[in-house]
Amino acid sequence: GAFKISTEGAGAWASSATMNTATYGGRGIGTTTALVGAGGDGSDDKNTETYNGTAWTTETALNTGHYIAGSFGASSTSAMMASGYDAPINVVDVEEWNGSAWTEKANVNTARRGGGGAGIVTAGLIFGGYSTGIVAICESWNGSAWTETADLNTAQEDIFQGIGTQTASQCVGPPTENETFNGTSWSEQAE
């Protein structure tokens, strides 16, 4: 056999403005404009900041702490934070961001933290995480209610975050887990 060599264009990292509040365990949505919410464990776990491509702005805080929540959305004006941790417990609470405020939505079925999320505010998923142990549970959001769907093949927590849509998602978690969802089932991918 022969090897085929290909090259890809290289990208470059650049510095940008610093967030107003130091955070860890927060979840983000977006690309050049972004939203970060729920960073920090304890008093900071309700923080929300948006990024306009140049600077960060402190926004209305979440109603409930969602540290290491499952998050998904399309932009800095349309996002969801689902479940997560608000010391000392995992929470079932879900909130939707409309660009200026958080609104409580229907609760998830299983409280967990460290799970992933994918999709938009009217069609999303949260998957994996830690409940009373590491879980493979996947729940689907239709804009008004949560339904448990096909579980991940491998229970995972501290998921790096999900990407994609409700019917075409990818879950990447430590140390080398990689699964895709086609709207019906999860499939293991090369790690």
Where are the regions a protein language model picked out?
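Polar, enzyme-active/binding microenvironments
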Residues: 1-191
